[in-house]
Amino acid sequence: DWLLRVLFTPGHTMTHLCLLLEKKGDPYAIFTGDCFFNAGVGNCHNGGDPEILFQTVSTLFEKFPDELLIYPGHEYLKHNLEFTNHYEPMNLAALAFSQKLKGVNLDEVFFINTMNVEREINTFLRLTSKNLLKQLKLEEASQKEIFLTLRELRNQW
């Protein structure tokens, strides 16, 4: 009843893979390595391509069910939430999650989010947020342009 499926997820690197765990044919959990993180996505410094990463995220991760569990390769949650809160300061879910992290040692605690939580706190999945677009001054930009702008801003963060 359990199946582990290998998914080709280029972008962070051109050969990146994720592992999707299915239960009775339905997505249950994904092990994302460095492609997708709590509140963020991977960088493209090691031979990756941000445009391909956009395609991977927009065609794969956005289609997963809300209850899918996400196991990233390692933790950037606090830093990623700081980025989200800076560029989307009216994101109440991200602000609340940041409050939840106060006093938490992320070297000892690892958060396993669901896709639903990620859709609320992950700036790279919120490319239609009016508050984000206004903050970035990209109200007329395509989702791809917004993603690429965010990826470049996150590279400098």
Question: What is the predicted role of each segment?
Answer:
Residues 55-69, 77-157:
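Accessory terminal helices/loops
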